Amino acid sequence: MSTFVAKDGTQIYFKDWGSGKPVLFSHGWLLDADMWEYQMEYLSSRGYRTIAFDRRGFGRSDQPWTGNDYDTFADDIAQLIEHLDLKEVTLVGFSMGGGDVARYIARHGSARVAGLVLLGAVTPLFGQKPDYPQGVPLDVFARFKTELLKDRAQFISDFNAPFYGINKGQVVSQGVQTQTLQIALLASLKATVDCVTAFAETDFRPDMAKIDVPTLVIHGDGDQIVPFETTGKVAAELIKGAELKVYKDAPHGFAVTHAQQLNEDLLAFLKR
């Protein structure tokens, strides 16, 4: 099993497929590197090296009590990039993982980065703030934490419906829903709850100004988890030269529901 050891001793799992120009994937909340298997197989079969890791506290990585914050997540990515000596890497972040890769560029620069892709990402700001009243009300996130601490398995099981848009007519197999629950339950409860605080409260607006590589923003306008109008749309406006693609009626989990469209768009961006 491929792992590296972070600066604080946390062991972090990653998978590394294929050869060619590298693409590094950062997963969403409740998930792990396995969420990317269809994108990784597609791109690695077409001449790219694809790498995905389990964020600390999730999947097969260690479960430290502390360090579940975006500066640490970004530093973990920096260490993985250095560990593998990646150059001209394209960073792809989904949901809270979009914050990981944006913060990486803000903290560590873009010398090793060829491009950035933000998929249904929480950037530039997910939660409400006095100067960002359009953000998601903080009591929504407080409820998430309360329900997770009461019955995590049921919360995640119920979360599948809005995540995949099943409650809006999207068709997702029972197998995928079961896999999502299984992946989510591998994670540390502490990390799962801490990450709610991280993605609800972290302001990435300063990070957006530091992004100086070609950027593709993809978001579904049917996203019930991370609303397009206050995240993806704004991020594309704040990042200089960003390209925006909006998937009509797509849910938050469009990497599953719109996998072929996403794969083709990723490949086109890599070939630009």
From Swiss-Prot:
pH dependence remark: Optimum pH is above 9.0 for esterase activity.
GO molecular function, one term: arylesterase activity
Domain AB hydrolase-1 residue range list: 21-253
Outcome of substituting residue 30 to P: Shows faster acetyl-enzyme formation. Tenfold more efficient at hydrolysis than perhydrolysis with methyl acetate as substrate. 3-fold decrease in catalytic efficiency for hydrolase activity with methyl acetate as substrate
Thermal dependence of function as given in the entry: Optimum temperature is 70 degrees Celsius for esterase activity.
Documented effect of changing residue 96 to T: 4-fold decrease in esterase activity. Loss of perhydrolase activity
Name of one Pfam family that matches: Abhydrolase_1
E.C. number(s) listed in UniProt: 3.1.1.2, 1.-.-.-
Active site: residue positions: 95, 223, 252
Substitution effect: residue 100 to E: Small decrease in esterase and perhydrolase activities
Binding, acetate: 29, 96
Keyword terms: Hydrolase, Oxidoreductase, Peroxidase
Any further remark recorded for this protein: It is unlikely that perhydrolysis is the natural function of perhydrolases. Instead, perhydrolysis is probably an accidental (promiscuous) activity. Perhydrolysis is an important reaction that makes peroxycarboxylic acids, which are useful oxidants in organic chemistry, for lignin removal and pulp bleaching and for disinfecting wastewater and disinfecting equipment for food and medical applications. Perhydrolases were previously known as metal-free haloperoxidases.
Family (UniProt): Belongs to the AB hydrolase superfamily. Bacterial non-heme haloperoxidase / perhydrolase family.
Assembly information from the UniProt record: Dimer of trimers.
Function of the protein: Hydrolyzes phenolic esters, such as phenyl acetate, nitrophenyl acetate and naphtyl acetate. Can act on a wide range of esters, but reaction rate and enantioselectivity differ significantly depending on the substrate. Shows a preference for esters with small acyl groups. Also shows low perhydrolase activity, and catalyzes the reversible formation of peroxycarboxylic acids from carboxylic acids and hydrogen peroxide. In vitro, enzyme-generated peracetic acid oxidizes bromide ion to bromonium, which reacts with monochlorodimedone to form bromochlorodimedone.
PANTHER family: HYDROLASE, ALPHA/BETA FOLD FAMILY PROTEIN, NON-HEME CHLOROPEROXIDASE-RELATED
Descriptive protein name: Arylesterase
Source species: Pseudomonas fluorescens
